[in-house]
Swiss-Prot record:
UniProt enzyme class: transferase
Pfam family, one: NMT
Binding site for tetradecanoyl-CoA: H117, W122, L250, V252, S258, R260, V261, A262
Entry membrane topology: Peripheral membrane protein
Annotated protein name in UniProt: Glycylpeptide N-tetradecanoyltransferase 2
SUPFAM superfamilies: Acyl-CoA N-acyltransferases (Nat) (SSF55729)
Residues with Phosphoserine modification: S38
Organism: Homo sapiens (Human)
EC number: 2.3.1.97, 2.3.1.-
Length: 498
C-alpha cells in the first residue's frame, strides 16, 4: 500500500498539517474517525470543537520541535495584545499559530466538504483523485519487485511491536486500547466495545499472519498506544478476483493524536503486506477520502425502545409516547420460517455454495473457501449467529447471519452497555428476504439485543423500511487501495467488514 521509499512528498505528510485519527484516514488528528460508522446510530451529526494548545517556540527556530513521547505538541492560541510594545516576533508567532489552527481541517463527511479538503497524505498514495472520472479497471501501480525491508521510522520515543494475540495479556492490552480510544459517536456518548473473543475472530481468519497485527508502543514504559491490522481475503471487483487484504482497527491513543502516527501505521502495514506479494486492499471509513468506490448508509431497528430512549441512542417521535413506541416495535415471540435452525459444521459446503453463487450479482464481494466459511459463519456465542433454512428434503435454501458488537454507554448512571446486532450476510433462494430478516429480528430480540443495525447494501433496501428500520445519520464509504475502477451503488456492494 504506502510507498516503500520515503520521498519528499511522503515525508511531507508527517508534518504539522497531517493529523492522526482513529479509523482509516491519515489526514485528520483530533476527530475520532468513524471507521465503522458511528456506534451512536441516530446521533453523530455534530462535530465537537476541541481546544488546541501549542508549545512555545524559540524565536527564529525555523521549524517544529522533534517528536517525543512526553511532548504533546498541542497548539495554544492567544489573543493578540493591543499593547503596541509587543515584539513583532511575538505577533508573527501568534499569526502563524492561528494560520496553523485554521489549516487543521475537520474530517469531510460528504463529497461537497471533501472537495474543499486537502489530503496531503492520501495525495501520496495510489488511490484515485476525488474528481477523477474513472472508466477503466486495474492496478494504479504495478506490483513491486523490491519492497522496502526496514520498518518505517516512528517519531522519537515510540517503537514497533508485532502483537501476539495468543498471549492473553497482549490481547487484553489491545482490547483496552480499542475500548478506550476507538470509534465513538461525535457526542461522545457511545464507543464500540470489541470483546477479546471478537477480536480473535476478526483478526485471525484463515491465512492470518502475525506480522499483520502491527502495534506501536511507548519506548520507555512499553504502553500500547497504536494499532493497525490486515487480514487476507479474495475479493471480486466487477470481473476481477484479487488476493488482497482488509485493513481494519486503525487506532491511535487519544493523547497522541498530534504525533502523526497514523500515516506511519498505514505505510508500515502496507510494507508488511507488500512483503507477502499483496498490493491491493479494501477498507471502510465514515469520512470521505480519495476516492470511495461506494457509499452506504447505516439503518437501525429498535428492539428495546425503552433502553434506547433512556440512553439517548434514539428519541421519541413527535406525538409518540414511550408506550406507543414500544407497541410499534413489538415483535412476535417465535420465528415463522419452516426449517430455520442454527448452522452446524455439516452445513459448511452448502453455505459456501449459497454465498458464492449469490454474491456473483454484486460488484464488490468476497469469494470464500470452505475454511473461511467455517470461520466466519459457524456460530460462536456473543460473536456470530448464523441460521440456515433446511427444506424437508434436507437441502439448504437460505441463511441469515448477524454478529455481536456492543457499545459502551458513557456517562449514564444505570446503563453501561448497548447490545447491538449487525447484519452480516443474508442469502435467500426460496424464502422471501423480508421473511428471513423478520426472523432475524425476532432471533436477535430473543437473544437480548437492544438494536439491530444494517447497511443499505446488497438487497437490504427491500426490507429496511418495511421492517421499521430508521435511517442513521452517517455514511460508510468503501475504498480500494491501488485499484482503479468505476464507482458503484450501495445495492451493488456485497462485502461486509466487521
Amino acid at each position: 500500500m504506502a510507498e516503500d521509499s520515503e520521498s519528499a512528498a511522503s515525508q511531507q505528510s508527517l508534518e504539522l498539517d497531517d493529523q492522526d485519527t482513529c479509523g482509516i484516514d491519515g489526514d485528520n488528528e483530533e476527530e475520532t474517525e468513524h471507521a465503522k460508522g458511528s456506534p451512536g446510530g441516530y446521533l453523530g451529526a455534530k462535530k465537537k470543537k476541541k481546544k488546541q494548545k501549542r508549545k512555545k517556540e524559540k524565536p527564529n527556530s525555523g521549524g517544529t520541535k522533534s517528536d517525543s513521547a512526553s511532548d504533546s505538541q498541542e497548539i495554544k492560541i492567544q489573543q493578540p495584545s493591543k499593547n503596541p510594545s509587543v515584539p513583532m516576533q511575538k505577533l508573527q508567532d501568534i499569526q502563524r499559530a492561528m494560520e496553523l489552527l485554521s489549516a487543521c481541517q475537520g474530517p469531510a463527511r460528504n463529497i461537497d466538504e471533501a472537495a474543499k479538503h486537502r489530503y496531503q497524505f492520501w495525495d501520496t498514495q495510489p488511490v484515485p483523485k476525488l474528481d477523477e472520472v474513472i472508466t477503466s479497471h486495474g492496478a494504479i501501480e504495478p506490483d513491486k519487485d523490491n519492497v522496502r525491508q526496514e520498518p518505517y521510522s516512528l517519531p522519537q520515543g515510540f517503537m514497533w511491536d508485532t502483537l501476539d494475540l495468543s498471549d492473553a495479556e497482549v490481547l487484553k492490552e489491545l482490547y483496552t486500547l480499542l475500548n478506550e480510544n476507538y470509534v465513538e459517536d461525535d457526542d461522545n456518548m457511545f464507543r464500540f466495545d470489541y470483546s477479546p473473543e471478537f477480536l480473535l475472530w476478526a483478526l485471525r481468519p484463515p491465512g492470518w499472519l502475525l506480522q499483520w497485527h502491527c502495534g506501536v508502543r511507548v519506548s520507555s514504559n512499553k504502553k500500547l498506544v497504536g494499532f493497525i491490522s490486515a487480514i487476507p481475503a479474495n475479493i471480486r471487483i466487477y470481473d476481477s478476483v484479487k488476493k488482497m487484504v482488509e485493513i481494519n482497527f486503525l487506532c491511535v491513543h487519544k493523547k497522541l493524536r498530534s504525533k502523526r502516527v497514523a500515516p506511519v501505521l498505514i505505510r508500515e502495514i502496507t510494507r508488511r503486506v507488500n512483503l507477502e506479494g499483496i498490493f491491493q486492499a479494501v477498507y471502510t471509513a465514515g469520512v470521505v477520502l480519495p476516492k470511495p468506490i461506494a457509499t452506504c448508509r447505516y439503518w437501525h431497528r429498535s428492539l428495546n425502545p425503552r433502553k434506547l430512549v433512556e440512553v439517548k441512542f434514539s428519541h421519541l417521535s413527535r406525538n409518540m409516547t414511550l408506550q406507543r413506541t414500544m407497541k410499534l416495535y413489538r415483535l412476535p415471540d417465535v420465528t415463522k420460517t419452516s426449517g430455520l435452525r442454527p448452522m452446524e459444521p455439516k452445513d459448511i459446503k452448502s453455505v459456501r455454495e449459497l454465498i458464492n453463487t449469490y454474491l456473483k450479482q454484486f460488484h464488490l464481494a468476497p469469494v470464500m473457501d470452505e475454511e473461511e466459511v467455517a470461520h466466519w459463519f459457524l456460530p460462536r456465542e456473543h460473536i456470530i449467529d448464523t441460521f440456515v433454512v433446511e427444506s424437508p428434503n434436507g437441502k439448504l435454501t437460505d441463511f441469515l447471519s448477524f454478529y455481536t458488537l456492543p457499545s459502551t454507554v458513557m456517562h449514564h448512571p444505570a446503563h453501561k452497555s448497548l447490545k447491538a446486532a449487525y447484519s452480516f450476510y443474508n442469502i435467500h433462494t426460496e424464502t422471501p428476504l423480508l421473511d428471513l430478516m423478520s426472523d432475524a429480528l425476532i432471533l436477535a430480540k430473543s437473544k437480548g439485543f437492544d438494536v439491530f443495525n444494517a447497511l443499505d447494501l446488497m438487497e437490504n433496501k427491500t426490507f429496511l423500511e418495511k421492517l421499521k428500520f430508521g435511517i442513521g445519520d452517517g455514511n460508510l464509504q468503501y475504498y480500494l487501495y491501488n485499484w482503479r475502477c468505476p464507482g458503484t451503488d450501495s445495492e451493488k456492494v456485497g462485502l461486509v467488514l466487521q
